[in-house]
Amino acid sequence: MSKVGVVPLIFLVLLSIAALQNGDDPRRQRDEKQSPQGDILRSTLTKYSYNIQRRCWAGGSPCHLCSSSQVCIAPTGHPAIMCGRCVPILT
């Protein structure tokens, strides 16, 4: 390879290394940015969490309080997701 071809090659390699050290890595930029969907979900959960907790205590207990040997049942008798009664699992 001639000197004319080696000089631009070295320049491109050095330029690429400098760009990576300056934080131009798209993976890092993607991790640093927060998605607007996450912000919307977070604000919605914060806004309605009090109502969800209040309904749980009025109609039963939160399902996450059930132990591994219990299942959470809603007042209608169907499995519950958020609130209900902790009932032992029949084996």
From Swiss-Prot:
Principal location class = secreted
Q: Which residues form the propeptide?
A: 24-55
Q: One Gene Ontology cellular component annotation?
A: extracellular region
**Does the entry annotate any disulfide bonds, and if so which pairs?**
C56-C72, C63-C83, C66-C86
Expressed, tissue-wise, as follows: Expressed by the venom duct.
* Location in the cell: Secreted
Q: Which domain of life is it from?
A: Eukaryota
Q: Which UniProt keywords apply?
A: Cleavage on pair of basic residues, Disulfide bond, Neurotoxin, Secreted, Signal, Toxin
GO-annotated molecular function = toxin activity
* Residues annotated as signal peptide: 1-23
Similarity comment: family membership: Belongs to the conotoxin M superfamily.
UniProt free text on domains: The cysteine framework is IX (C-C-C-C-C-C).
Role according to the record = Probable neurotoxin.
Listed name of the protein:
Conotoxin Im9.1
